[in-house]
Amino acid sequence: MKMDNKRRDAIVQSFNSRWKYRYDKDQYGMADAWKIIYTPDIEGNYVGDCEDYALSILYRLCDESHIKMWWLLITHQAGICLVGRKNKWKVSHAVLRYKGEYVDNWTKKFGPKSEIEKNHHFHVFHGYGWAYMTALKMLISKIVRTLKK
């Protein structure tokens, strides 16, 4: 799964042009919902929060293949890293790590870890983007969203 930076950046730029931030509480009525945004809303925007942004970018970088996406997560070539504003123990934001570079809905472009660290601290445990954490968060939020219906 080889992708040059030009194509990678074009995918991110295309997604960014239609991205609209919305808190999970406002969108789903729950504090945390990890979800891939597959389709735009009625206004043509991809709507979600930082976790949704990271997951949705990764999914698109993997040619919209769940198998490729989970392969990258399991082999630690990609990860959804949790970061915080105040210290390495409090989590308040999610960042995509993809093949050694990072992107989030604040920077909106790939860059080094140091770019993210200007505003955030990587969580002492969950800042590495382990696949099990992503799987658990996605599963739990799917169950909660389903039960709320």
PLM ranges: what are they?
Residues M1-K149:
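A structural boundary/capping signal
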